[in-house]
Every structure is written in structure tokens, then in C-alpha cells.
């Protein structure tokens, strides 16, 4: 550290500080103060770097699961679908299909058992969007799947992820277990009449569409 920071070299000219619990006392500019970062409105990535991944109590302290609580006790499944439609939320794949419209296709189905499938297999070479989200903010994924289940009257969710990707697998499995331990998954979620289960399903080296 001293070798690179004590001299006016290219290393120091291109170094930035970031906020953390163990940050060094340095005079480097804070990376969050740069226009390309400070002018961002982070939504899907709002918790990245701000909470310990998989720590449910930090997540809750950062308003995590508050939308789920509101949906379960203040909204009907139909109202949740309409809220998602009105939000303009779209899929993050190539088609950018409206999420609320997709949910509305499943909601009226009267099947006794319905599943919410979450494809984090990410078989494209070099792709890391899904795995990155699992590693940094797994509880937001859990919350979104439960909301999906409530809105579509579904009973269970499977999270597909390729075997061998140990860090994201461990992160989402820990988050799911924490959700079960704290009444956010399983029977009568948060004391409501809605029950929902979730598990990870490991895939082989293949492409899941």
C-alpha cells in the first residue's frame, strides 16, 4: 500500500476509496462521488455493497421484505399484479417482456399446484448478471419470488443455478434458510394465510432457456 500510494504514480492517480467497515484513512477520492456513480438511481442494485450478502437482519434493517409485508396484509393478489404492471418492470432478458403481464397469465390458472421458476443457470460464456445478484443481494431475489407466488397464487419456487458455482449457490441457500428460520418462507408467512416454499435446483452444464 505505502509503495503505491506514497508516490505520484499511475497507481495513485487511478485509485479511488470506497466506504466500508474497514476502510483505510486515505486521501483518495471517494468512488461514490464520481458523476457516473453519484448520479445513478440504483434500484435492482440498491443493496450492492451496502449490506452483507445473505444477512437477513441487515437486509430487513435496509427495508428488506417491507414490500412483501405490505402485499400480504394490505393488498390482494390482483392488486399486486396491477402494481407490477403499472411499475413498468420488464424482464432483463433480450425480449424485455412486461413482468406484470407475464404474471397475469399465470394468476387466473386454477391448477392445484403452481410453481415459480427462477432461471439463474446463466449458461452464456462469461455471463455474470444472475450469479452476481445472488452473491451480493440474495434476499431481494427471495422476496421477489415470494411476491410472485402470492400474486399468482403459486405454492413453490425453484431457483435453477449451474452446479459448481459455489459462491452464489451458498449465498442463495443461506438466504433461503434464513427466510425459513424467520417465518418468511414456509407455512403462514409472517403470520398471514399465505404459504410458500423455495429450494435450489442445481443444473448440469447445459443451457436453460
Regions found by a protein language model. Name each.
Residues 1-209:
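Feature of Fe-S/electron-transfer and energy-metabolism proteins
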Amino acid at each position: 500500500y505505502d509503495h503505491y500510494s506514497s508516490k505520484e504514480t499511475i497507481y495513485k492517480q487511478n485509485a479511488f476509496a470506497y466506504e466500508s467497515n474497514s476502510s483505510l484513512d486515505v486521501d483518495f477520492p471517494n468512488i461514490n462521488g464520481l458523476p457516473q456513480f453519484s448520479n445513478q438511481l440504483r434500484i435492482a442494485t440498491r443493496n450492492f455493497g451496502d449490506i452483507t450478502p445473505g444477512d437477513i437482519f441487515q437486509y430487513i434493517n435496509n427495508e428488506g421484505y417491507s414490500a412483501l409485508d405490505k402485499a400480504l396484509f394490505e393488498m390482494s393478489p390482483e392488486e399486486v399484479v396491477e402494481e407490477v404492471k403499472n411499475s413498468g418492470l420488464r424482464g432483463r432478458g433480450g425480449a424485455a417482456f412486461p413482468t406484470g403481464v407475464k404474471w397475469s397469465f399465470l394468476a387466473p390458472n386454477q391448477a392445484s399446484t403452481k410453481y415459480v421458476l427462477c432461471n439463474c443457470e446463466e449458461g452464456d460464456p462469461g455471463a455474470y448478471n444472475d450469479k452476481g445478484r445472488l452473491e451480493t443481494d440474495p434476499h431481494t431475489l427471495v422476496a421477489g419470488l415470494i411476491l410472485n407466488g402470492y400474486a399468482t397464487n403459486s405454492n413453490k419456487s425453484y431457483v435453477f443455478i449451474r452446479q459448481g458455482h459455489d459462491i452464489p449457490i451458498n449465498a442463495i441457500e443461506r438466504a433461503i434458510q434464513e427466510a425459513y428460520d424467520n417465518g418468511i418462507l414456509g407455512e403462514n408467512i409472517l403470520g398471514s394465510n399465505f404459504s410458500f416454499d423455495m429450494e435450489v435446483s442445481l443444473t448440469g452444464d447445459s443451457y436453460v432457456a
